[in-house]
């Protein structure tokens, strides 16, 4: 995941994140003291009620979000060796701004005149 993908057929965070990814992000947002992948994995699977997501998927997602700056991470030592603890780098409102900025920035690079014109024509 080098960046986020936006599905124009969906709305809200559903356009950017799968259900389990939203839940994983919520777990970290609600844990200012930080959360490791095991904690996120357990809580997400409890929230999914009947469905499950692998710990590897959780780890890959958390790392991708850390790499693009949505989450912060700190490598710590503990029982069993090293592990990452993830912290919010931004809250939900900040994440929504981040998504918007990423999309608009990409559009401005690809279609600067058309993007400016389209933004003028949008009625809030």
Q: What are the functions of these language-model segments?
A:
Residues 17, 76-97:
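Short, cationic-aromatic polyanion-contact patches
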Residues 93-124:
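Amphipathic alpha-helical dimerization/coiled-coil segments
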Residues 66-76:
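A short, conserved structural fragment
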Residues 58-68:
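Basic amphipathic alpha-helical segments that dock to polyanions
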Residues 34-44:
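Short acidic, hydrophobic short linear motifs in intrinsically disordered regions
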Residues 42-55:
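Short helix-coil junctions and helix-kink-helix linkers
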Residues 1-26, 31-34, 91:
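Short alpha-helical segments that sit at the start of domains
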């Amino acid at each position: 995941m080098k960046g986020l993908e936006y599905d124009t057929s969906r709305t809200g965070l559903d356009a950017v994140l799968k259900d389990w990814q939203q839940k994983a992000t919520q777990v970290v947002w609600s844990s200012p003291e930080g959360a490791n992948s095991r904690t996120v994995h357990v809580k997400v699977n409890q929230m999914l009620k009947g469905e499950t997501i692998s710990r590897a998927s959780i780890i890959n997602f958390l790392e991708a979000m850390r790499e693009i700056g949505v989450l912060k991470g700190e490598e710590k030592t503990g029982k069993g060796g090293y592990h990452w603890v993830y912290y919010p780098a931004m809250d939900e409102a900040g994440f929504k701004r981040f998504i918007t900025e990423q999309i608009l920035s990409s559009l401005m690079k690809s279609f600067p005149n058309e993007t400016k014109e389209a933004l003028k024509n949008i009625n809030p």
